[in-house]
Amino acid sequence: MKCSIITPIGPGHEQLFLQCRNSVNKAITQSMGPFTEITHRPIDDTQGLKGRSASRNSEVAEAVAHGADWIFFLDADDLIIIDAFEKVMDAVKHYDAIWGAICELKKGAYYPQIRDEQDVPIRNVEDVILMDPFFSLQMGHFVKAEVALANPFNVELNTGEDFDYYLRIWHKYSCVKLKVPIFINRRGMHSKGPKSASGTDWRRNVEEIVRRFKREKQIQLNK
């Protein structure tokens, strides 16, 4: 199986991407897990004109055209965990998309930590909706290439596009959130381009996206 790692490089992330790329190279050297070929596909958007969503979408199409079976979405300011590929050895046989526990490296810290309040399992889209989005899912994840191609990111959204995508994937496909991390989210490193947004903007948009999704899909929650 072939896996393509897709990384948009936004304004100010050029140096951070070098560290991101280094983490990918180390992980590949450590173990390719279930994959016979792993390629890293960065997208240069350092002018910030294209945006994360359009960058990811175009590169997914390129990856599929080159025979990718799986995609790993990794932001330029984040790091893949060295044994990430090993950790999904079994999961790729059973799921269409695979997330891990949220692990973060705070600005100025030396060591990453698992984010608190992740004890409640995520089993379905209802669980995603019920959970505070800060503690549920993040961008670094594996997804079957055909699933990613069929579910592009919404290019009209400058923030919250991640959660819009998560909801669609968890609603339609077999997904899992592992109890172990597969990437490290580096806090306080956000890009500052024309399509960037603050954490407050993100939460406000995500809450509206969740409300709209529940209404459109007529999802009834038990809690």
Can you say where each PLM-predicted feature lies in the sequence?
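Glycine-rich, basic loop-to-helix element that forms the pyrophosphate-binding segment
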Residues: Q47-A63
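Acidic donor-binding loop at a coil-to-helix junction in glycosyltransferase catalytic cores
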Residues: N158-Y165
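A recurrent flexible, glycine/aromatic-enriched loop bordering the glycosyltransferase active site
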Residues: R123-V143
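Short beta-strand-to-loop acidic/aromatic patch adjacent to the donor-nucleotide binding site
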Residues: A68-L79
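Conserved donor NDP-sugar-binding/catalytic core segment of glycosyltransferases
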Residues: F85-I114
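Active-site donor/metal-binding and catalytic loop motifs
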Residues: K179-V210
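Catalytic donor-sugar/metal-binding loop of nucleotide-sugar-dependent glycosyltransferases
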Residues: L167-I184
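Short, well-formed alpha-helical segments that are part of the catalytic scaffolds
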Residues: T7-I28
